[in-house]
Every structure is written in structure tokens, then in C-alpha cells.
Amino acid sequence: MWKDNRISEVFIKKKGIGMIALADIPANTLIMKELPISIVKINNQTVSDIFQILYDVLSDPNKKSLFEKFLPNSINEFESHRNNLMKEFHKLKKSRLNNVYQFINNNFTSDEILLYGAKYMCNAFEFNNGSAILINGAKFNHSCVPNVIFVSDENYMYFYTVRNIKTGEELTDNYVDIMSNTKTRKNRLFNQYGFDCQCERCIGSDKLFYQEVEKIQSSKFYFSNQISVNHRKKLQQNSKNLKKNPKKTIKATPK
């Protein structure tokens, strides 16, 4: 994991852990690059992305220790998810993931399973065609007008500023689709993440932020495209090197 020394993790009143700028940071700056601790690809072979990741994390003591620090620490706001979550969990018993079912069922209570499920729902990232857990990326709080966007390649998640950031300003990304309307965003945030969004856009008007949101989406598309281009160039260069030195194995890594 690489992090710009101008950003820092702090405690923010009414929010908990968050990220702030220790100095002015220009727009379009890469401020963090992180390798997920767990990834699952979602395709027609996927049985349950949530429990596949939970198994990977909870069966590894080091990953489990990091994951348990995530919020929430209580299941009070997530009781409405219990039935659906446990229904999905019990389906594993008769699937090819029976080993996942047996491990979780033998080691954790239903309340613990719900809590770990809530931690997943509140902290997992979409990652290519799947889901991922990032320890530091999860520390950014949400805004419907974020000043940070995140994009991924095959291995890493990259975090960029989308406008000039002032010293002391909180750095935020988005948990839901910022192109959706206020009602849709607030419902999704409350149902999945357990909070009522009070960002400047949610207490104001979507119309006032339309151009800014469009610009943020354009920035995300631009950086995603740039990372894809750089990754392809890296792979092409490695392929050329392999042809020149066929006995030498070169591992493709993102720039």
C-alpha cells in the first residue's frame, strides 16, 4: 500500500474514522494505491460473494484482526438484513461451498455472522467484476459530491483527487451511484450502510450540483481509461521482454 504523506487518518466527530488533508493537494493527484486483502470475482460460477470473502478473511488470523476493526460494531441497524443473509448462508450447505458453510457455522453465532455481514456490506468495494476488501480505502467517508474517486486495474485500487483540496479538508469518496437522485441515494445509504446522509447535496438540491457531479464522473472515466492503457502497455512490454529472454519469467505488475 502506498499513501501520499499529505493525507492522514483521523477521528471525525459524528462520523468516526475518516481521512483528511494535512496540506493543500492539487486536483487529479494520486493520493493512495492499495492492494486488497481479499477479492472475489462475480460470474456465473459465483455461489455467494459475501460468504466467499468472509471465509477468506475469517479463516486468516491476520485478515480477521484487520477486518474486525471495521464499523459497525453493533447489529442494531442491520436486523432487517438477518433473514436474507441467513437464508443465503444456509444455501451454502448444499452447494460446492459446503466447506465455507461448515467453517462459519462451527465457529460463529448467528449474531456474529450478521455483524460480519454488516461489516462486509458497509466496507466492500466493487472491484473489476467482483468485490474486494481494502483496509485503508474503507476509511474514506461518503459524500454525494466526493472530492476523491477510486478506480482499479487487475491488482490495485487507485484513489485520485478530483478537485483542489485545502489543508484540513476531509477527503471523501462515494458509496453509491452519485448520478442517481437524492431519494434513491439516501434510501440505499440508509438500508445498506445504516446512516442518513446529510452531505451538502442531500440537504440542498441536486440541480445545484449537476455540473460538478458530471465532472466527477468524467474524471473517473478518464482515470479508469488511463490505468487500463498503462496496464496494457506494461503487459505488452513484458511480452516483448519474454520474447527476448524466454528463460526469464517476468511478472506483470501495474505501474
Swiss-Prot record:
InterPro entries: H3K4_H4K5_MeTrfase, SET_dom, SET_dom_sf. Residues 235-255 are annotated as: Disordered. It is an enzyme of class 2 (transferase). One of its GO terms (biological process) is methylation. Keywords: Methyltransferase, S-adenosyl-L-methionine, Transferase. The keyword S-adenosyl-L-methionine applies. GO terms for molecular function: methyltransferase activity. The keyword Transferase applies. Its EC number is 2.1.1.-. SMART domains: SET. Residues 5-176 form the SET domain. It comes from the Viruses. Belongs to the class V-like SAM-binding methyltransferase superfamily. This is Putative SET domain-containing protein L678. It comes from Acanthamoeba polyphaga mimivirus (APMV).
